């Protein structure tokens, strides 16, 4: 495998396999094992179709420019650029909130395992409860660690977070396999191989379906990967999403399948909270804690840029000026929202805009993102609920709806107004695009309706 292809695979894999893997076993709960595996497979295929469509439509961007969702909107309708910015803002904001929830889940357990392991007399004291309050640690970490990083204009210091993420997820996989093999010490519930029935089905499968969708979402970085390739032919580039999705699929089988079989119906939204305190578990919790602390700024920066773009769009709309270009917008084209190795590229692009725009406005947006993230994180304890909402909105838009829309509008457009026969392969991709677009709309509407009316808890 060529090095640039390998690099692209690792970029997509890291983007997809973030801290959301902690909720993967919980996603199996309303499905049962076999239907869960089938759903995981189907969502993987749909996500792969979206990535393959992106490799097909990248050629419609002029060769002198880098491919991006923003550039493609200029070929269809510049006004829909706000849809892409909204999807990015929702996804990045939601992922940031989920990171803070993970902080609230893990830090009290880390503190308890280190300082209160052998102190049973503290279990009922007021001091004990105060030092194990999740809100305390969310507050401390967002004030002293996350906020300073989010207000930085350079993310170069976070370039090693990608390696930390890969190592953390690999360690988590090993930890889950170990406890699956040695599960006699754990409180295991009923494992359903088919869909749970009766009282055992606490909530609808539609409420956790978006977690499967969210798990494969790496589409916002696909164009950046394509732009880095020397050979941009479909025959070569298609290997990148295929390898990445297949690797992610097997990783999710390990984490999701074995995690569900370990705890059964007792599984919760964050599997790490179920393991007993031990050195190996504490190391895993510390690794995931470090991951989410370093990754939060990588979500805040693109969220901030998207919010700024939306504000500019609204201002232009009120003035009756919908530009045919995005010269006044903060670019997201080359920003990898989860890979710190891409962050310097975005920073270089963002510098001129930061000089022209008021830093005060940028700081206000950053402060609002941090404040609302904090308020939601201390109010919501369900990691699964946040990931389900993000998956049903931002992930479906980025993975299915936008690639489907662009594919249907652009693929085969070169044959419009000509007498040439449209090749069968072009027709297949065009109608695949339409199907993916319809599927994305259906998932969004059905899942959001289920979440709103049926609810999603972490238990």
Swiss-Prot record:
Record field: transmembrane: 8-28, 33-53, 82-102, 131-151, 161-181, 206-226, 240-260, 278-298, 364-384, 386-406, 434-454
Subcellular location: Vacuole membrane
One cellular-component annotation, GO: membrane
Signal sequence, start to end: none
InterPro entries: AA_transpt_TM (IPR013057)
Membrane-related topology note: Multi-pass membrane protein
Biased composition (Polar residues): 335-351
Keyword Transmembrane helix in record: yes
GO MF annotation terms: L-arginine transmembrane transporter activity; L-glutamate transmembrane transporter activity; L-histidine transmembrane transporter activity; L-lysine transmembrane transporter activity; L-serine transmembrane transporter activity; L-tyrosine transmembrane transporter activity; transmembrane transporter activity
Keyword Transmembrane helix: yes
Short name of one Pfam family: Aa_trans
Biological-process GO terms, alphabetical: amino acid transmembrane transport; transmembrane transport
UniProtKB keywords: Amino-acid transport, Membrane, Transmembrane, Transmembrane helix, Transport, Vacuole
Family: Belongs to the amino acid/polyamine transporter 2 family.
UniProt function note: Probable amino acid transporter of unknown specificity.
Protein name: Vacuolar amino acid transporter 5
Organism: Saccharomyces cerevisiae (strain ATCC 204508 / S288c)
Lineage: Eukaryota, Fungi, Dikarya, Ascomycota, Saccharomycotina
């Amino acid at each position: 495998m060529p090095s640039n292809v390998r690099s692209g695979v690792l970029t997509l894999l890291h983007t997809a396999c973030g801290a959301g893997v902690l909720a993967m076993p919980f996603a199996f709960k309303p499905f049962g094992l076999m239907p869960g595996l089938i759903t995981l497979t189907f969502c993987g295929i749909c996500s792969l179709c979206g990535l393959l469509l992106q490799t097909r439509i990248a050629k419609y961007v002029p060769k002198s420019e880098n491919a991006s969702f923003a550039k493609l909107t200029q070929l269809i309708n510049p006004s829909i650029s706000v849809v892409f910015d909204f999807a990015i803002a929702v996804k990045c904001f939601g992922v940031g909130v989920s990171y803070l929830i993970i902080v609230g889940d893990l830090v009290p357990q880390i503190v308890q395992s280190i300082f209160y392991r052998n102190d049973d007399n503290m279990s009922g004291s007021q001091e004990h409860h105060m030092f194990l309050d999740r809100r305390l640690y969310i507050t401390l970490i967002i004030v002293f660690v996350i906020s300073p990083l989010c207000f930085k204009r350079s993310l170069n210091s976070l370039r090693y977070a990608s390696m930390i993420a890969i190592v953390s997820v690999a360690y988590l996989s090993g930890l889950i396999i170990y406890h699956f093999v040695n599960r006699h010490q754990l409180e295991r519930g009923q494992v359903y191989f088919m869909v749970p029935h009766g009282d055992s089905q606490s909530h609808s499968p539609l409420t956790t379906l978006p977690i499967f969708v969210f798990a494969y979402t790496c589409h916002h970085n696909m164009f950046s990967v394509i732009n880095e390739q020397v050979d941009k032919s479909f025959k070569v580039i298609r290997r990148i999403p295929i390898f990445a999705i297949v690797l992610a699929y097997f990783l999710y089988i390990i984490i999701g399948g074995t995690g569900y079989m370990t705890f059964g119906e007792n599984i919760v939204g964050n599997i790490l909270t179920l393991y007993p305190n031990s050195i190996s578990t504490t190391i895993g919790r510390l690794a995931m804690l470090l991951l989410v602390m370093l990754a939060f700024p990588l979500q805040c920066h693109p969220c901030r840029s998207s919010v700024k773009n939306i504000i500019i769009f609204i201002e232009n709309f009120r003035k009756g000026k919908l530009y045919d270009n995005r010269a006044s917008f903060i670019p997201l084209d080359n920003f990898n929202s989860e890979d710190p190795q891409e962050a310097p590229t975005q920073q270089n692009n963002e510098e001129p805009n930061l000089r022209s725009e008021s830093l005060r406005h940028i700081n206000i947006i950053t402060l609002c993102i941090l404040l609302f993230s904090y308020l939601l994180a201390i109010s919501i304890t369900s990691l699964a609920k946040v990931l389900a909402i993000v998956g049903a909105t931002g992930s479906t838009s980025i993975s299915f709806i936008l690639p489907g829309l662009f594919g249907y509008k652009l693929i085969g457009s070169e044959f419009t107004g000509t007498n040439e026969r449209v090749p069968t392969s072009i027709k297949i991709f065009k109608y695949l695009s339409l199907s993916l677009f319809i599927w994305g709309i259906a998932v969004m509407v059905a899942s959001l309706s289920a979440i709103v009316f049926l609810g999603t808890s972490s238990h």
